[in-house]
Amino acid sequence: MNPMKNRQFQIRRMIPEDISEVFRIDAQTAALYWPESSYHFETERNDASRCWVAVNENGSILGFLILWLIVDEIHVANFAVHPEYQNQGIGTALLIHGLINAWEEGARVSFLEVRASNLSAIHIYQKLGYEPVGIRKNYYQDNHEDAIMMNLESEAYTKIYNQQE
């Protein structure tokens, strides 16, 4: 499980100049997407945010990840891969990259909410060791879909960190 090998993209910190492209990806992939102003807040003013993008050799953004580091916990706040680039390991690589960097800043557990119908995201999370721990009924405002709460406990998180090269 190393999507970092032989990849045709780079992962780097998100910068304000990325926001319009990140916003378009979010709008294409999410029924409830963040306004552009939220991305500006996350990249420019939120000290808890850790924002990443995957870019190809032309500099086009393929996906993004926004994490919030709160003491020793990392919360997956927003995460998407452009529809044309899904199922190519980009999402997994982004998440691993973000988790490893957060580990180096002291994170030891991670948590998130995911739509119950988002099977591809659930698959990525479970592959990395996240486990469902509860349901938030009617969590999403657009269709009242449930959110599955998932945690990555310390032991599974340690395994991800130790598998890096």
What would you call each of these model-derived segments?
Residues 4-9, 13-84, 95-97, 101, ...:
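Acetyl-CoA-dependent GNAT
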Residues 82, 86, 115-117, 142:
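Residue-level recognition of the GNAT/N-acetyltransferase active site
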Residues 87-100, 123-127:
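Conserved acetyl-CoA-binding loop-helix of GNAT-fold acetyltransferases
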Residues 113, 131-148:
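Conserved catalytic-core motifs of GNAT/GCN5-like acyltransferases
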Residues 125, 130, 150:
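Conserved active-site tyrosine of GNAT-family acetyltransferases
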